[in-house]
Design a protein with these regions (language model features):
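Acidic, surface-exposed loops and disordered segments
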Residues: 2-123
């Protein structure tokens, strides 16, 4: 989603309305599928947010086939309809050993233009 796309969908910035007007979706339209490319774009945008010491410790697995979602079923105790009807399940993991790759993570951030070299040099 680009900035213009986000602004088009943005309707309200009132914290109380957002907090108390939220919904928890329990059933999805089984006929609507989010493309793999769109899921990747959403993950890339979400991970643009800063993390502690900019280590980006998150890792993702996208289960989007019926077979892969079926493998998850024994692990889901509640709200199984969400797994059954969703376009995909996105599993989010935290890398507890990310500090071991700190230098590589910082170098990659500089290469991708996500971190200035002078900030990287201070790490």
């Amino acid at each position: 989603m680009k900035e213009e796309k986000m602004n088009k969908n943005f309707k309200n910035n009132d914290f109380s309305d957002i907090t108390f007007g939220r919904k928890s979706v329990r059933l999805y339209d089984e006929n609507y599928k989010i493309s793999h490319e769109e899921m990747l774009e959403m993950i890339q945008e979400a991970t643009a947010a800063p993390s502690s010491v900019n280590m980006q410790p998150w890792r993702f697995i996208i289960a989007e086939t019926e077979e892969s979602k079926a493998k998850l079923k024994p692990l889901i105790r509640f709200n199984t309809r969400q797994n059954d009807t969703s376009s995909a399940m996105i599993l989010i993991f935290g890398d507890m050993l990310n500090y071991e790759l700190g230098e590589e993570i910082y170098d990659q951030a500089v290469a991708e233009g996500k971190m200035p070299q002078e900030v990287r040099d201070q790490q």
